[in-house]
């Protein structure tokens, strides 16, 4: 999504970290120097396919498999191709500090990509983890907006820094999104933000007139 704004970066996963021991590690590389372009991400359009990655570390491989199967069962209502990969380390070197599992899903649509995820925890069935992620994705897709409930707040920052007017359609005006908006107004008082909708954390449309010149 950030590539649409001209933000050039890459992220590589070295190892995962789960509560409480943590220990996760990623490598992020980015190129600076160019101005960000405004974003036009309002409606998602038709769903084309769904992908995903279900993982577990220091746990039996069937945990990741069950998460994936449960998610796929929920997502079949979309009637599109679904491919959820499974990642585990059973029987091989495992650099992780503690056990954990999770699943990330993404829906590729005509004009956007929306995601949903869930983490495992002690006493929580793998099937519940998969269903939670799939249900979250379906809920956001049902709004018809281009951004899921997590991307809705994160992209507001980049839109505020982009040169020009951005229009963002978010699945949910969460408390996080409202906090981001308040912070942008405090730090970048010249940036104009107009919000339509969003009552009771519902779908919303944001119009942001930003740019580094507003600093």
Positions of PLM-derived features:
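Proline/glycine-anchored alpha-helix kink/cap motifs
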Residues: 1-6, 44-51, 129-134, 149-164, ...
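Phosphate/diphosphate-binding glycine-rich loops and adjacent basic-rich segments that engage nucleotide
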Residues: 4-7, 12-71
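Flexible, glycine/charged-enriched surface loops at secondary-structure junctions
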Residues: 6-16, 75-96, 140-154, 167-170, ...
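A short, glycine/Asx- and small/polar-enriched loop/turn
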Residues: 21-24, 97-101, 202
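Glycine-rich phosphate/diphosphate-binding loops and the adjacent beta-loop-alpha structural elements
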Residues: 54-58, 140-142, 159-167
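Oxyanion-binding "anion nests"
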Residues: 66-114
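C-terminal, non-catalytic macromolecule-binding modules
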Residues: 123-140
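Internal helix-turn-beta structural module
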Residues: 161-215
